[in-house]
Every structure is written in C-alpha cells, then in structure tokens.
Amino acid sequence: MTKLRRVAVMFSSLLIVLNCYAQEKDSTSLAKKTPGITSFILPTALVGYGLISLAGNNVIRDLDFTTKAELQEDHPLFAAHADNFLQFSPAAAVFALKFAGVKGRHQIGDAAGIYAMSMTMMTGSVTYLKKLSKRQRPDNSVNNSFPSGHTATVFASAEFLKQEYGKEYPWIAYTGYAVATATGALRMYNNRHWLSDVIAGAGFGIISTKASYILYPKLKRLFSRNQTSAFNLMPTYQSGGPGFYLSGNF
C-alpha cells in the first residue's frame, strides 16, 4: 500500500496543478480550447485500475491471469512485432499531415514542442513506476512490466493526433485510437504485458498529452515574456529520448 499511496499523492498533486491551469483565462491563440480537468477523469480511472492490480490478490489481478491463460491457450505460438513501430505511427501521421500542408491546431514547431513535452512526461512517469513496482512480465523475462511503455507511447501519440486533427477530421482521431488499441492488444498477445499493464499505460499516455496541451503554452509564454532577452525553447531528441533545448541572449 505504500507504493499506492506515493503514486496517489503524485497524481493528486498533478491534477490539482492542471485544474488551476485549466481554469485560467487565456487570451493567446495557442492556449485556446485546452483540455478541461473533466477530460482527465477517464484516463485517471485507467491508471487507477492498473494501480489497484498492484495491491495484491484482487479481482483485477485475477483478470490479468485469466486473460493471459486464454490468450496463450487460443494463440500459443503467436508472434507479431508490429507493436514496436505502431507505437509511433499516430504521431508520425501528425507530422506527415503537417508537412503535406493539412492545417491542424498548431504550427509544426509548437506541435513538436507539445509532443516532446508529452513524451518526456510519459517516459519519466512510466520509467519511475516500472522501477517502483518491479512487476514480472508474463513471459517471466524481466521485472519491469507495469505499466506498458509501448501502450503509453501509442496512446500519447493517438491523443496528440486527436488534439491536432480530431475536430476537423474525426475519423483520423478514431483511426489513431484504433491503432493504439491494437498495439495494446499485441503487447498481451506477445505475452509481454498483463491486461492491467496495458490499461494503465493507456491512461498514462493520454494524461501526458492532455497535460502537455495545458502546460506547454504556459512554459512557452514564461520564456518569451521578456522581449529584451531572446529566449528560444525548442524540442530536441538526445540520449535516447525527447526533451527541450533552451537558449538565450542576455
């Protein structure tokens, strides 16, 4: 229960901060129509579902074992590794559409910044919980099963696609989430994750992207407030992961 309390405190604090930001009036075009706090209810419930499975023997954990048994019984030799590249496909679609000239919510620079922030938040939270939970994978390979990183990545990407193009092209959003769901299913069919790993991973991914749409405009405005100091905040990829590069002239 100590693990659950620590994670619960972290998420409660995050949601309080996001609620404060979401309720602020914002006159800039970048911050228009940011996700409201109510949009975090479903992904938070998904994370909560997964956290309950860490509490020991309960109905949710039992469902993990029965789901694994059924999948292994029906498809004992299943092996398909499309999930390794599918996890990035919704985000790749966003940038492909932007390069093709299809207008979304943001210009490509801001979209890249939002996505980099989402990936940074998602990777940090997932990596921390993998080390904290030390859950063994269903194939008994390693103890870093919870939550599913592939699923978190693809759902963060699917939410990114939805936020950028879902209003004008709803079918694009549906396609992104269909790909995300298929990726999560493949993680279980390949015997790499439990059901609760996948469900929690989906929640972490969605929360990371929604939070980035709230926090990125605040962070960008913070560094551009002083016009006499030329600051530039740019997304970057280094040391095997996404991040930000800040430069400035004083």
Named regions from a protein language model:
Residues 94-98, 126-127:
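Membrane-embedded alpha-helical segments in integral membrane proteins
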Residues 79-82, 112, 116, 148:
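Hydrophobic alpha-helical transmembrane segments of multi-pass membrane proteins
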Residues 54-55, 98-103:
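Structural signal for the C-terminal ends of transmembrane alpha-helices
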Residues 23-93, 130-139:
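N-terminal transmembrane-helix/juxtamembrane module of multi-pass inner/ER membrane proteins
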Residues 84, 100-101, 166, 171:
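Short, flexible segments with low predicted structural confidence
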